[in-house]
Amino acid sequence: MGLGIALAAPLAVAQSAPSSQPWMDTALTPDQRADRLLAQMSEDEKFQMLRSYFGLGTDKIPKPEGALGSAGYVPGIPRLGIPAQQLADAGVGVTNPGGIRKGDYATAMPSGPSTASSWNRQLAYTGGKTMGRESWQQGFNVLLAGSVNLQRDPRNGRNFEYAGEDPLLAGTMVGESIRGVQSEHVLSTMKHFALNDMETRRNFHSAQIGEQAMHESDLLAFEIALKIGDPASVMCSYNKINGVYGCEHDYLLNQVLKQEWKYPGYVMSDWGGVHSGSKAALAGLDQQSAGEVFDAAVYFDAPLRMAVSAGVVPRTRFDDMVRRVLRSLFAHGAFDHPTQRQSIDGKAGLLAAQRVAEEGSVLLRNEQAALPLSKDVRRIAVIGGYADKGVMSGGGSSRVDYTINGGNAVPGITPTTWPGPVIIHPSSPLQALRTALPNVQIDYLDGTDRTAAARAAKAADVAIVFATQWAAESVDLPDMRLPDNQDALIETVAKANPKTTVVLETNGPVRMPWAERVPAVLQAWYPGIGGGEAIANLLTGAVNPSGHLPVTWPVDESQLPRPSIPGLGFKPAKPGEDSIDYAIEGANVGYKWFAARKLTPRYPFGHGLSYTQFRMGGLRVDARGSQLTASFEVENTGPREGAAVPQLYVALPDGHATPLRLIGWQKLTLKPGEKRSVQVVAEPKTLADFDAKARRWTIAAGTYRVQLARSASEPVQTAEVTLQAAQLP
């Protein structure tokens, strides 16, 4: 179909609604309402629900009439009361690419690893709720959030959108965020289904992995997020999985997602992820995204019409596609709570973002109690990282350009085009430190002159070096090094002043050749629009750090399953028959890989320091059928209030391929001297294996060693429990 015809297709007929619209009866279930509405739709109206338009337009294709200016747009059908679908990116805030919507701004939330580092379910929910509310207030009823891909490699350019390496932690935290988004009557996606764990050649490469390993790692994260969050839509991924494109993957979309997991929502494609019409529809894809711009054809228009007419795609499947979209619109409030454009509460959003950054920043190292900053400090040298202007953020479709504090604080950093521009959010740690410490002289140097930086550091009581690393969608990092000779800057400053603290604003783990030469390191990730204030509060002790790593921090690339991956770096992806062999580690992602290979990381999964101390003990474990319950006590033995994150791991019976699994955790805030009893029920599937032949989860009979731990590498107490063989429902 020609482009002009395609753009003329939307049906926005201005007719009065019928006097009787039974599908608007809120006493009915979403399924019943969808069935009643589907029965009244014409074939053209049905097809209208199965493709979105690019909501921004291009230099050749104008922005669709009615679109607010965003990632996608599906016109409504007024005669039936069907609302338009206004789709906005993404998972760290409502985007406004290039300021296309004049005056619109949103809260730039901290990155996914920051939220995950909080290990705080309620905080993840609240962050999602903030994004959902701002989406709704800006007129968007679909938010392309819910990124739950596992972080298999620290060089993945999109790790800043994800929630770590463990399926239980990632699935739980992203599921809670999705639940928060949808509490504001905004549909959320869950993405990118599945194994979209690297960006290099993402449109072409094949993720190779066994079925059992896939279910016990990436798919388990999706399954847990699905159970908790009930996302309206699942976005299929660009890449191939075992040679089959994600949006044509019958096994993943039909057999696993819709049949085994009984998912009632709809599957939408990623932008540019569709390669066929009937094949994709039969494999489980329900809605094509902006095909007129990103795909070779609008497969879900003329090609799908022909396939339905010819019986290649049965009408039952065609109706099922439409019904799933309608059901999600009913289930998550798009019909009953239409959006009302209004001003957002930017100050409330900033405070929400700041709280996430405070709980999600991780104190990696703190020798000789270097932090919090001593009250005796009279002069501080702050060096590097744009700390005088703001904090780093990630690039690509999730980039939030405009916040309550304004636009980019440092325009012109390359790249300035996709997946840039590089955005420095205007939240200056330097200014926040000066506000918090009015009687301290705080000098700033940008770090470009290492000699001057060393001179300033030597003259100060304390030096604080801010180091940044930009990462973005569609490209991977070439290696784990900090860019722009920042390692040399840190070495120089630390040599000049042994009381040097390093604050990292990075996509994830980086090499730290200087780690033993600085007393303190704070990992702030991409801390969002409240990041400057959060960092200052953590450094000064106004806030006690409580973040714990959601990923293992390798010493360098030699400890990774794939030390070298050809083609990584900031360069365009090229077509090819490439594959990534995830079978190397299989389900042993992150700390499981390190445990299996007996490797010692720089910092283990779950690691995080505090300004107080905690004692854990009294572990008792009870098993009844497939339910394992652990009880223990936690006491704050230090001088100030703080939050502990006791973690529970299980070492499976001898001979098992996976040596260790996180089975649960609890985050609790305790006053000095306070002791509390805690009970944690393990997620049953963390105790089980996926039987690929029988297509079910089974618990093997044997002795399981449950560890109460501070991190994956620091068990405090172990208790054994015997489990009987069982099959999970």
Task: Specify the residue positions occupied by each region the protein language model found.
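N-terminal export leaders
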Residues: M1-L3
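Glycoside hydrolase catalytic-domain context in secreted enzymes
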Residues: A14-F690, T698-E714, L728
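Extracellular and select intracellular beta-sandwich modules with Ser/Thr-enriched
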Residues: P715-A719
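Short beta-strand edge segments in extracellular beta-sheet folds
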Residues: E720-L728
